[in-house]
Amino acid sequence: MAILAMVVFHFTFDLMYFGYIKAGTVFQPEWRMFERSIAISFLFLAGLSWQHTHRAGIKWLTVWRRVAVLGAAAVGISIVTYFTFGPYMIRFGILHLILMMSLLSLPLLSLHWAAPLACAVALGSYFIWADGPIQGSVWWMWFIWTNETAGSVDYRPIMPWGFAFFVGMGAHALMTHLNAFAYHGPERGWTRPFAFAGRHSLAIYLIHQPILFAGFNIYGFFVV
C-alpha cells in the first residue's frame, strides 16, 4: 500500500509539474501530511525488514550488497534530479537515509528490542523541540533538518526521519521476542501482488517516475 500511495503522490506531483492542476497543490497541508506518512511507512518497513534479514546475526554480504545498490541508486537520483530540478535536487533523500540508517543500525541488530526504540525516541524528539527546519550549515544536512536544503523535492535527514527506521527495527525485535511471527505458510493468492511489489520496491521506486515523466511528455506532444 505504501508503494501505491507513493505512485499516487508522484502522479499528482507530475500533474502539477506539467501544469495540469493548480501550482502548489502538493504543498498544501493535507498533501504534505500524505507525503510524510508515505515516507514514514517506507522507513518503518525498511527498518523492519532490515531487522528481519539479520535476525540470526549480521549477514555481511547482504550489508555490502545493500551499500553498493543503495549507494549507486542514491547517487543516481541526486544526479538525475540535479538536471531535472536544479536547486531543488535531492541531496539527501529517502534512499540516502535508508543507506545511512542501515549502517548506523548495525550495532543495534543484536541488542534488546528497547535499544532501537530508545534511539527512535531520541531522533523523534526533534518534532517536540523544533518547529520545522533549523538554521544550520549545509554540511549538517545529512544529520539534522536544516533550512539550507529544506526546499529539496525529497529531503530526509537522520534527525528526525530516521526515527521511523528504528521504530521498524524495534517493532520486529519486540514481535520476535513475543513469538508473534508464528505463521510460515505459503502466500495466499491475493497477497502475491503485494509480496512481489515488496520484493521489488527499490526497482519500482526508481523506474516509476521516469515512466510517468515519459507518459506526460508523450501525452503533451501528441494530445495537447
Task: Give the positions of each predicted feature.
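Alpha-helical transmembrane segments and their immediate juxtamembrane cytosolic regions
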Residues: 1-224
